[in-house]
Swiss-Prot record:
Annotated positions of the Phosphoserine modification: 175, 437, 567, 665, 1106, 1404, 1459, 1496
GO cellular component, one term: extracellular exosome
Protein name: Inactive serine/threonine-protein kinase TEX14
Sequence ranges of the ANK repeats: 27-54, 55-84, 88-117
Residue span of region Disordered: 848-877, 963-1048, 1144-1174, 1348-1470
Organism: Homo sapiens (Human)
Function: Required both for the formation of intercellular bridges during meiosis and for kinetochore-microtubule attachment during mitosis. Intercellular bridges are evolutionarily conserved structures that connect differentiating germ cells and are required for spermatogenesis and male fertility. Acts by promoting the conversion of midbodies into intercellular bridges via its interaction with CEP55: interaction with CEP55 inhibits the interaction between CEP55 and PDCD6IP/ALIX and TSG101, blocking cell abscission and leading to transform midbodies into intercellular bridges.
This protein's encoding gene: TEX14
Short motif (GPPX3Y): ranges: 795-801
Matching InterPro entries: Ankyrin_rpt (IPR002110), Ankyrin_rpt-contain_sf (IPR036770), Kinase-like_dom_sf (IPR011009), Prot_kinase_dom (IPR000719), Ser-Thr/Tyr_kinase_cat_dom (IPR001245), Tex14 (IPR039339)
Location of this chain's protein in the cell: Cytoplasm; Midbody; Chromosome, Centromere, Kinetochore
């Protein structure tokens, strides 16, 4: 009677289907329908009860899942397997647990069902039960717990009466009775029928879900339906297996997941196998525990001498962990012996190898007869329990053949990939495995044990599987001897049908081979078919001797036996023999030939020589071990033969008379061979490795001759003398051969090690060379970073010098913009002014070579600022010109030029005095002759410059701009007296601090630069702004901040112009923020006198008040923009607020950043560019370099030949204003400077410590200024002195900051020319505070002064003694001032004419040259566009204001021209003489000083 069966919900699995009309399909369908009658009818027809559907599910699984108890009973009675694995690894026990029916589960457990099994997700039956819901799972889980408790009680040793009372899981089932109570179930009847106590089932096999247990033997049917007895397999607890006290712990792996450990059980030494799971296993890995259960079931049924015997099963207390107790294994797996612990077993005798192979084949044949397929046969599965004794195990993956050819897999766990190296292709591809699959694996083991190589060269299993899938398969190793080669070649065919050789055939071949070896030891070679069979075989491993029957367990015993035989593996004698064998193994010792042909009791080692030597050629050094064994086994056999047969004794008696002679002759030949080998080895030792490749075919077995090497005739004669050797002589020879083989093996190993060491040393040497190259380039690049370690240039280099071009060092990192590939063009564009031997050799930093244009210029400016305002002014202007040229040329590559190059080039003028201080020591070491030569060259160049005859170098398209800079700076590259002030000393430390901070950036920056002027001393490097002129903004890193006087006020407006344009471009620049942090910006020093001229103030009020206000608004807007890399945020409103009414825009000369200049240049047409460059060449512009848009130029008429515009700013001295205005403006300027520096510092670095330092420095500067103020007042300095001192303040050294304030506080009435002697006096006042300069340097300066004394005397006379008396000059200045006040309006035209006459000569000789030098190359790179409207408008206004200023100046300084007419060139010579005395010059150089200008016409 059928009924519809509903599938439990939620069901963990789906039910499969069968779509055919077979009885098996009908069985499944009737089970699903619940038709018990039809199911029983079909079962009576004798169908296969465990037929599976599409998901691998049996009818029992379906019945248990649906909770059909009657179906389960009948299916179990017909032999259905309760532990059958579906494709997902689940069993009918899982299905019964999910159904929640205790009776179904108890029936399955009673039939042998196991509660420990897991599906592929690692879930056991208890987990399935819990997924069925709380209502159904509660009782079934409690039932499982009762079964586990009962099993634990049995294991713990409870009496047998317990099994009598509860002999079946069904007795543990409880169901609700009609009375509401619990009654005990009956396994043989309905649950309601009670069973009498003490009734025991006749089955007598107890299974409670943890394996079958039985109290006595009983019959059972194997898979082949054969009657058999069940063996007793004890179930023990964990505490019964312990570690032995008299032996160390020994464990080894027995496959990928199993580990074997030697322990003791009840006094018996056993080996326990357990699962080696990771510490935190994945859930699916729990299914690996089923492998031990499967092996336990297989091992409990199988008994064979060569199968590892299972002695007991050890269950943990919670029954979750299973361990199998096997017989003791003393050595380990074959895999560990061959590959992991080969050093412990260096010699594997061939006889042992053959015995092991025979044992494995026998065990495998037994499994096949029993209907099992091992499937996982490998060297892991072969366990060597003792020397020469192997056991086959690892049966967990074994398949059992059942009825109708069905194979039963107890685990459904796929074969591990680690075993794919030995597995047959069909096993790897998870196809049906047969006995041919085991033959394939056996062949792999045979090849592995004979070659010491893991199959597939030890590739990973996943790679092997990919190779098999792609159609790649293994072939037999050609190194195998012939019988074994045939076996392997036949056994590893891809297709199973091609594996024609079965295990019985293989066993027969191995047996015969063993017999042949044994018989060959006691018969003549002509009688031995083995020798004849192998002699013609071309393979190198033909002759495999068999060892004795007593292989040693440990290498120590083998070493002892070697010693007993007299072997000395490390002696020179053996080494010499081995060397010869290595050099030409085809030419073995003739005694080996004799031993082969004369006596077969000792195997011939000649083939072994060839076979051993072939090992390196094939790249398989692992052959050495078993090849050594062959020689070694021959020695052992000789020992046995010496003691054994009477035939041997008779041969000794017969050969007695000739034995001693033959032995002596043999020893002599051996000595000869050793000597020859020594000589030959010493000559050709280097080529021994290459000569180890040879072929066994080179040996001529017919005549014994050598095809590759002809031995001496005596050696050939020795062959005939040794034909009648006795066994004693054979023993001695075999001993030598053994030593030879051992040493040959050692030498091969040493050669490999030496080769590896040589490779490593070569790699290390290459790395060291590369590192040294990097370090050399790095050190070269750091030469200018540590500039103080290098001497100053001893003279100007030649004009046509081009620095070398070097490649970038590997250790130097390019900047973030990645523009270094454009740097190789720099050396041609930037000629250096330093000595050729001192230039930078690293291409990465050659972008800063042009910075040396400003190096010498700024150095001379710093010196001139120590008391020569006039010269310093001119030099500052020249520096502006050169700096503009340099910055332009250094950025010719375009707006994306290397930021690090911009960084390095623009900081060249950072270091004012420190570079000279650093190099004082090296300068003192210079040769006096070099100084003299330099002096003469400078003198000659100065003459040319003074007379306007300076030659023009030829035009170079790529270096035209820098050539002008070079020519402009040649007069400046002179030695300077080391006059320093305390502030200069501090500045030296500041530069060192910068250098220390900059070096780790990886850019070898050039910090060896000169100072432009006083402000360069006062201010370090200003971030972001990069032009070279005369004024810098305060650096946050600086330690002192002397006041500027009006110089900073002038620079403030200039700063705005530059900052405004640059801040816009900085947002578009490709430079990284880090690359522009130390870029400096210098500004023109404006006319100080105009600030203090009442007429200038009036002019300012009339003409520029409104534009300045507009500009100030623009300035504030520009400075409100965020700056990259921590640019200074200047509060210009406060800085310029107090002086807005007296600061004309025309007083500021904006020297914009390099990018601005390049952009302007690239944007304009060539014609406009030429006009602009021509305008820049004006001599007037040399005093105030400007590079501005065309709109800023104004047409003007002047006497300079090629100028068509008025300069935008002229820093010529004008008549000073009142004392009060000067003093007040100075104080305002001082406050502005202080505020600016503090604001700038806080915005950039926010370092309270440095801000405090700056404040302290300013306080000290103010105090010093006040002291000098009083000093000036007490010395009755005329008011006219102020103007000159104001001019001085822009260029005076850092050592005289307070002098500026002192000068400001005096009345401004005298001209600049009159103020020089007093300025020198005050400058000397501070110079005296410094420590004395180097005596050697002073001597050099004094020598230069003496050599040019006549010129100096002449200048001193005309200039009233250069130093001049302060009183005379003061008197003249007073007269001049009075004259100016009276005749300012009358002498305007006269002064204009005089000024034109003074400058006419200079213009006439220099204009063309300067114009031509300023012509930029046509290939200048386009730059980014920047807004120029506001700047041009500002410059136009500056020109207007400048014109008015010059008019006022000319009107109030009439006496200046008068004094010039009276004194002639005395004033100018006075300045020059003082300047020359400082520098050691005897004649003037080209220092252009324009005090006034007539360009305003």
């Amino acid at each position: 009677m059928s009924r519809a069966v509903r599938l439990p919900v939620p069901c963990p699995v789906q039910l499969g289907t069968l779509r055919n009309d077979s009885l098996e399909a009908q069985l499944h369908e009737y089970v699903k329908q619940g038709n018990y009658v039809k199911v029983k009818k079909i079962l009576k027809k004798g169908i296969y009860v465990d037929a599976v559907n599409s998901l691998g599910q049996t009818a029992l699984f379906v019945a248990a899942l649906l909770g059909l108890r009657k179906f389960v009973d009948v299916l179990v009675d017909y032999g259905s397997d309760p532990n059958h694995r579906c494709f997902d690894g689940s069993t009918p026990v899982h299905a019964a647990a999910f159904s929640g029916n205790q009776w179904i589960l108890s029936k399955l457990l009673d039939a042998g069902g196991d509660l420990r099994l897991h599906d592929e997700r690692g879930q056991n039956p208890k987990t399935w039960a819990l997924t069925a819901g709380k209502e159904r799972s509660t009782q079934i889980v409690e039932f499982m717990q009762r079964c586990a408790s009962h099993m634990q009680a049995i294991i713990q040793g409870f009496s047998y009466d317990l099994l009598k009372k509860i002999d079946s899981p069904q007795r543990l089932v409880y169901s609700p009775s009609w009375c509401g109570g619990l009654v005990q179930g009956n396994p043989n009847g309905s649950p309601n029928r009670l069973l009498k106590a003490g009734v025991i089932s006749a089955q007598n096999i107890y299974s409670f879900g943890f394996g079958k247990a039985m109290p006595w033997f009983q019959f059972y049917l194997t898979g082949a339906t054969q009657m058999a007895y069940l063996g007793s397999l004890p179930v023990i607890g964990e505490k019964e297996v312990i570690q032995a006290d008299d032996e160390p712990t020994f464990s080894f792996f027995s496959g990928p997941y199993m580990v074997m450990t030697n322990l003791v059980w009840n006094g018996s030494r056993v080996t326990v196998k357990e699962l080696n799971l990771p510490t935190h296993p994945h859930c699916s890995r729990l299914r690996l525990a089923d492998l031990l259960i499967a092996e336990q079931e297989h091992s409990s049924k199988l008994r064979h001498p060569y199968l590892l015997q299972l002695m007991a099963v050890c269950l943990s207390q919670d029954l979750e962990k299973t361990r199998l107790v096997y017989e003791r294994i003393t050595i380990g797996t074959l895999f560990s012996v061959l590959h992991e612990r080969r050093s412990q077993f260096p010699v594997l005798h061939m006889e042992v190898i053959v015995h092991l192979l025979l044992q494995i084949s026998d065990a495998l044949r037994y499994l096949h007869f029993q209907g099992f397929i091992h499937r996982s046969l490998s060297s892991y599965a072969v366990h060597i329990i003792s020397p020469g004794e192997a056991r086959l195990t690892n049966l967990e993956y074994m398949l059992e053949s059942e009825d109708r050819g069905v194979q039963r897999d107890l685990t459904r766990v796929p074969l591990p990939t680690q075993l794919y190296n030995w597995a047959a292709p069909e096993v790897i591809l998870q196809k049906a495995a047969t006995v041919k699959s085991d033959i394939y694996s056996f062949s792999m083991i045979m090849q592995e044990i004979l070659t010491d190589d893991i199959p597939w060269k030890g590739l990973d299993g996943s790679v092997v599987k990919k190779a098999v899938v792609s159609g790649n398969y293994l072939e037999a190793d050609v190194r195998l001897p012939k019988p074994y080669y045939d076996i392997v070649k036949s056994g590893i065919h891809v297709k199973q049908k091609d594996r024609t050789m079965n295990l019985q055939d293989i066993r027969y071949i191995l047996k015969n081979d063993l017999k042949d070896f044994t018989g060959a030891q006691r018969t003549q070679p002509t009688e031995s078919p083995r020798v004849q069979r192998y002699g013609l075989h071309p393979d190198v491993n033909v002759y495999l001797g068999l060892t004795s029957e007593h292989p040693r367990e440990t290498p120590d015993m083998e070493i002892i036996e070697l010693k007993e035989m007299g072997s000395q593996p490390h002696s020179p004698r053996v080494h010499s023999l081995f060397t010869e064998g290595t050099l030409d193994p085809q030419a073995p010792d003739p005694c080996l030939m004799a031993r082969e042909t004369q006596n077969q009791d000792a195997p011939c080692p000649a083939p072994f020589m060839a076979e051993e030597a072939s090992s390196p050629s094939t790249g398989q050094p692992s052959l050495c071990s078993f090849e050594i064994n062959e020689i070694y086994s021959g020695c052992l056999i000789l020992e046995d033969d010496i003691e054994e047969p009477p035939g041997a004794a008779s041969s000794l008696e017969a050969d007695g008379p000739n034995q001693v002679d033959e032995l002596k002759s043999m020893e002599e030949e051996l000595d000869k061979m050793e000597r020859e080998a020594c000589c030959f080895g010493s000559e050709d030792e280097s080529s021994s490795k290459a000569e180890t490749e040879y072929s066994f075919d080179d040996w001529d077995w017919q005549n014994g001759s050598l095809s590759s090497l002809s031995l001496p005739e005596s050696t050939r004669e020795a062959k005939s003398n040794l034909n009648n050797m006795s066994t004693t002589e054979e023993y001695l020879i075999s001993k030598c051969v053994l030593d030879l083989k051992i040493m040959q093996t050692i030498m091969h190993e040493n050669d490999d090690r030496l080769r590896n060491i040589e490779q490593i040393l070569d790699e290390v040497e290459m790395k060291q060379k590369e590192q040294e190259e990097r370090m050399s380039l790095w050190a070269t690049s750091r030469e200018f970073t540590n500039a103080y370690k290098l001497p100053l240039a001893v003279g100007p280099p030649s004009l046509n010098y081009i620095p070398p071009v070097l490649q970038l060092s590997g250790g130097q990192k390019p900047d973030t913009s990645g523009n270094y590939p454009t740097l190789p063009r720099f050396p041609r564009m930037l000629p250096t002014l330093c000595d050729p031997g001192k230039q930078n050799t690293d291409e990465q930093f050659q972008c800063t070579q042009g910075a040396k244009d400003s190096l010498e210029t700024s150095r001379i400016q710093n010196t001139s600022s120590q008391g020569r305002p006039r010269e310093s002014t001119a030099q500052a202007k020249a520096t502006q010109f050169n700096s503009a040229l340099f910055t332009l040329s250094s950025h010719r590559q375009g707006p994306s030029a290397s930021p690090s190059c911009h960084w390095d080039s623009t900081r060249m003028s950072v270091e004012p005095v420190s570079s000279e201080i650093y190099n004082a020591e090296s300068r003192n070491k210079d040769d006096g002759k070099v100084h003299l030569k330099w002096k003469m060259e400078v003198k000659e160049m100065a003459k040319k410059a003074a007379t306007g005859q300076l030659t023009v170098p030829p035009w170079h398209p790529q270096s035209s701009l820098t050539l002008e800079s070079e020519a402009e700076n040649e007069p400046d590259a002179l030695l300077q007296p080391p006059i320093r002030s305390p502030e200069n000393t501090d500045w030296q430390r500041v530069i060192e601090y910068h250098r220390e901070n900059d070096e780790p950036r990886g850019n070898g920056k050039f910090d060896k630069t000169g100072n432009n002027d006083c402000d360069s001393d006062q201010h370090g490097r200003q971030p972001r702004l990069g032009s070279f002129t005369s004024i810098r903004h305060p650096s946050p890193r600086q330690k002192e901040q002397p006041e500027h006087s009006e110089a900073f006020q002038a620079s403030s407006d200039t700063l705005v112009a530059v900052e405004k344009s640059y801040s816009h471009q900085s947002m578009q620049s490709t430079c990284s923020p880090e690359s522009s942090e130390d870029i400096t910006d210098e500004f023109l020093t404006p006319d100080g006198e105009y600030f203090y001229s009442s007429t200038a103030q009036e002019n300012l009020a009339l003409e520029t008040s409104s534009p300045i206000e507009e500009d100030f608004e623009g300035i504030q807007g520009a400075f409100a923009q965020p700056q990259v890399s921590g640019e200074e945020k200047f509060q210009m409103r406060k800085i310029l607020g107090k002086n807005a009414e007296i600061l004309p825009r025309s007083q500021f000369q904006p020297v914009r950043s390099t990018e601005d200049e390049q952009e302007e240049t690239s944007k304009e047409s060539p014609k406009e560019l030429k006009e602009k460059d021509i305008s820049l060449t004006d001599i007037q512009d040399l005093s105030s370099i400007s590079y501005e848009p065309d709109s800023s130029f104004k047409e003007a008429s002047c006497k300079t030949p090629k100028i068509n515009h008025a300069p935008t700013s002229v820093s010529t001295p004008l008549s000073p204003g009142s004392v009060s205005s000067a003093a007040s403006q100075y104080k305002d300027c001082l406050e502005s400077i202080t505020f600016q520096v503090k604001t700038e510092f806080a915005s950039c670095w926010n370092s309270q410590e440095f801000i405090q330092t700056l404040s302290d420095d300013f306080i000290s500067v103010r105090e010093r200024a006040k002291k000098l103020d009083s000093l000036l007042t007490s010395s009755e300095t005329p008011p006219s002195r102020l103007t000159g001192l104001k001019r001085l303040s822009s260029f005076i050294g850092a050592g005289s900051p307070s002098l500026v304030k002192a000068c400001d506080s005096s009345p401004p009435h005298a001209t600049q020319r009159r103020s020089l002697p007093k300025v020198e006096a005050f400058s000397q006042h501070h110079i005296d505070e410094l420590p004395p300069p180097s005596q050697e340097l002073l001597d050099d300066i004094e020598l230069l002064k003496q050599q040019q004394g006549s010129s100096t005397v002449l200048h001193e006379n005309t200039a009233s003694d250069g130093g001049g008396t302060a009183n005379d000059q003061r008197h003249l200045e007073e007269q001049e001032t009075d004259s100016k006040k009276e005749d300012s309006s009358m002498l305007l035209s006269k002064e204009t004419e005089d000024l034109g006459e003074d400058t006419e000569r200079a213009h006439s000789t220099l204009d063309e040259d300067l114009e031509r030098w300023l012509q930029p190359p046509e290939e200048s790179v386009e730059l980014q566009d920047l807004p120029k409207g506001s700047e041009r408008e500002t410059n136009i206004k500056d020109q207007k204001v400048g014109e008015e200023k010059r008019k006022r100046e000319d009107s109030i300084t009439p006496e200046r021209r008068k004094s010039e007419g009276v004194l002639g060139t005395s004033e100018e010579d006075e300045l020059k003489s003082c300047f020359w005395k400082r520098l050691g010059w005897s004649e003037s150089s080209r220092i252009i000083v324009l005090d006034q200008s007539d360009l305003s016409d």
